[in-house]
Amino acid sequence: GLNDLPAVIRADVGISVENATEAVRESANVILMKKDLNVLEEGVLEGREAFANMLKYIKITATSNFGNICAIVAASVLLPFFPMTSIQLLLLNLLYDILCLILPWDHVDADLLTKPLEWSGRTLGKFMTFFGPVSSLFDLLTFVFLYFVLCPGVCGGSFGSLSAEKQSLFISMFQTGWFLESMWTQVLILQLLRTKQLPLIQSRPGRMVTGVTILGIVLFTLLPVTPVGKMLGMTAMPPVYFLFLVIDVIAYLLLVTLAKAFYIKKNQDLI
């Protein structure tokens, strides 16, 4: 009633019910459609869950982009060609963005819901500059393998000694190799950094996140052997490349896991 109006106005969060007087409803921040305070708890938890998933997206995406930018800058200086075409980069980002679009349906660890999370640009910068170079390190390792081992072995010599036709194959194979490595690491790092616990064991992602992750990896791994892949300048990779890819990705995930444990120990939290 009207006797509650002063209290509702002075409260940090004024709460009213649907059938209250018009003045009280207009002054309230929250209007309950039914007389049940459990609705407030559910709303708070939903808000914290949405905010936690938003923080995951921002921090992990910024980290991935930072690592890729560092690798592209280094490759542009050291290599006689671009490490990836612009359309390939856009396609890679499209896959990653599609995967991130389903993050709102991801599971959130219970410890993230016990208290409100805070947004801080300082922690974003710390997170990005800590994990980003790890990604760049394995990108550079992939560059070395592709430029000095795989591509010369398949094409029959170093890049400068090849004919124009062989150089075109060299470039296509290099770009395809880095595209696949970047896709695998970007997609899987999302699984590692979405939780401070052991992923897939102590903290399982939502079914939709898992499904899109697996589907994206399968489709984009097969892309180079399809007509669409050839239109994008890609080429089929030899079996030895996939052996390297598996070893590279496993080593990357292990190093990120160790780095994550160190980061949590130093900062008491991940997200």
Q: Can you say where each PLM-predicted feature lies in the sequence?
A:
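Conserved cytosolic catalytic loops of P-type ATPases
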Residues: 4-5
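Membrane-embedded transport module
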Residues: 1, 11, 16-198
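Basic, alpha-helical nucleic-acid-binding regions used in initiation and control of genome expression
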Residues: 8
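C-terminal transmembrane module of polytopic membrane proteins
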Residues: 93, 147-151, 155, 169-271
